[in-house]
């Protein structure tokens, strides 16, 4: 690294980074909120709608190797500035220039690149400024606050959509990542550079450090956390991308409206993931991370199928099952990330975090598209059975992961 790791008290910076992350994520659910009006306006299939939702993860995957490789060489604070700017520009492009499928994909890719420049670099900002003994709990708070940002994203986007139109959603929410950038600029001091080291000297092997990734994957603990995070992210982001549309179908199927706007409900449900992630990490520290992850993934699969089969039922049952599913999806989120950070060797921690994030958001890339493809394949949005198949297509991966790792003996270790 090209900077001195001067450790400071965590309570100086953790709340600041939690606030910044919440602002940076305000654009995350804009498309999920506007999916239905844009699908009708642009005459999109469910697969196309899912691909636009997946585009943010494509942008993330393209940018995250560069962003995380740089955090091992320069202060992650600088990467954060670039990420905030890209998020701002991507949302503005959606609000002013998007006219159909391909233009929306382009701007969502830019938004994803912005997320790559803020999410894991934001975690690196914290890890460079914390004592090792503090990391696990503060990581759990940081990852849990992903739900705060996405929850407010649903709510604010829904309120703006109801008051104005879909374009206004992106134009106003673009202020979120810009604000995150300014928070880090003014409230997070830079790390002190080490004298005598200059130049980035980045090569493709630095951006895609395959040899280093192989070292990481040869560590059974690290590999398990990474693949677990991939299946977790596939289910999580598919569910978040299609939850508003599913609630819309449920309202039609049951013949009655929900007690709140469906976008507001989606936001509130996301908030349940925050304590779930934090408390889940505390439970994992007591019962063993791997045992907890296995239990949560199986429970999440059951809750997801139960939610999908309840589409014609009363709103209170649907909302209760959606909350249960959200809690179980997020209950192992911090545990998976903390486990990876704690198990990765210090000299390749940045690369390990990059692979973890790359694989996780690779799952996020696949999830919404798989969900939309299965909807088209089995009857489209108007079929209750199609929603069951679509949910089944995303929860099955966690079950397969648990079965595989149990066979390999991973779940019997702490």
Which residues fall in each region the model found?
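Helix-to-loop junctions at the C-terminal end of transmembrane segments
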Residues: 63-75, 276-289, 375
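C-terminal transmembrane helical hairpin of 12-TM major facilitator-type secondary transporters
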Residues: 290-336
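Multi-pass alpha-helical transporter architecture, strongest
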Residues: 182-187, 380, 387-414
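Helix-loop-helix hairpin linking two adjacent transmembrane segments in secondary transporters
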Residues: 142-189
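Cytoplasmic helix-loop-helix junction between adjacent transmembrane helices
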Residues: 107-145
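Flexible cytoplasmic inter-helical loops of multi-pass small-molecule transporters
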Residues: 188-214, 414
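Extracytoplasmic gate region of multi-pass secondary transporters
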Residues: 31-32, 221-269
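Conserved MFS/SLC helix-loop-helix module at the cytosolic interface between two early adjacent transmembrane helices
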Residues: 62-98
């Amino acid at each position: 690294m090209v900077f001195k790791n001067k450790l400071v008290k965590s309570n100086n910076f953790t709340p600041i980074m939690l606030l910044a992350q919440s602002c940076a994520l305000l654009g995350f659910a804009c498309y999920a909120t506007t999916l239905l009006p844009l699908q009708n306006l642009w005459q999109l299939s469910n697969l196309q709608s899912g691909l636009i939702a997946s585009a943010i993860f494509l942008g993330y995957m393209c940018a995250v190797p560069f962003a995380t490789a740089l955090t091992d060489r320069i202060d992650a604070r600088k990467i954060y500035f670039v990420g905030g700017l890209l998020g701002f520009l991507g949302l503005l492009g959606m609000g002013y220039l998007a006219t159909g499928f391909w233009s929306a994909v382009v701007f969502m890719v830019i938004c994803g690149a912005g997320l790559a420049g803020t999410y894991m670099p934001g975690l690196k900002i914290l890890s460079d400024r914390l004592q090792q003994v503090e990391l696990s709990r503060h990581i759990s708070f940081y990852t849990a606050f992903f739900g705060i940002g996405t929850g407010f994203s649903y709510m604010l986007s829904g309120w703006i959509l109801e008051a104005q139109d879909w374009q206004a959603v992106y134009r106003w929410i673009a202020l979120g990542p810009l604000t995150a950038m300014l928070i880090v600029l003014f409230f997070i001091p830079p790390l002190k550079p080490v004298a005598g080291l200059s130049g980035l000297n980045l090569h493709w092997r630095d951006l895609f450090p395959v040899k280093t990734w192989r070292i990481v994957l040869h560590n059974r603990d690290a590999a398990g956390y990474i693949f677990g995070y991939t299946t977790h992210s596939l289910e999580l982001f598919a569910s978040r991308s299609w939850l508003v549309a599913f609630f819309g179908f449920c309202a039609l199927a049951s013949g009655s409206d929900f007690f709140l706007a469906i976008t507001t409900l989606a936001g509130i449900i996301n908030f349940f993931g925050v304590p779930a992630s934090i408390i889940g990490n505390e439970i994992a520290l007591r019962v063993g991370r791997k045992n907890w992850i296995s239990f949560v993934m199986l429970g999440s699969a059951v809750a997801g199928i139960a939610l999908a089969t309840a589409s014609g039922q009363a709103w209170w049952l649907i909302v209760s099952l959606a909350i249960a599913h959200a809690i179980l999806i997020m209950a192992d989120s911090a545990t998976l990330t903390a486990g990876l950070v704690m198990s990765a060797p210090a000299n390749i921690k940045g690369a390990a975090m990059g692979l973890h994030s790359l694989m996780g958001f690779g799952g996020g890339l696949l999830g919404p598209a798989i969900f939309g493809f299965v909807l088209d394949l089995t009857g489209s949005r108007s079929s209750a059975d199609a929603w069951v198949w679509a949910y089944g297509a995303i929860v099955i991966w966690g079950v397969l992961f648990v079965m595989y790792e149990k066979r390999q003996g991973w779940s019997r270790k702490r």
